[in-house]
Amino acid sequence: SYDSLTVVFGIASDKDIPGSLRPLAQAADKVIFTRATGNARAARPGELARTFHEISGKHAMTCPDLADAMELAVRGTNREDVICVTGSFYL
């Protein structure tokens, strides 16, 4: 078991973004949106955060790349928390 679930999420812009974000709204305590560096198809983190807010009413954090997102996730968790990195496997 764990205390808190932080999700680091990135996805290609041509995927079913709303369908992918709905489960996050139910399961995650914190969400950090990011994108794969050098992938032209990657959805922009700010757009993902806006769509997530429209779907869930919840706010999320954004980072320009995976390294920054992971640093933010690690800083915001403790030993009883879980970090899940998911989305398109370009990350």
Describe the function of each predicted region.
Residues V7, V31, V85-S88:
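Residue-level signal for inorganic ion chemistry
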Residues D16, L91:
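Short phosphate-engaging motifs
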Residues I11, R35-A36, F89:
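Short secondary-structure boundary segments
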Residues S1-I11, I17-L21:
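Metal-dependent phosphodiesterase/nuclease catalytic metal-binding core
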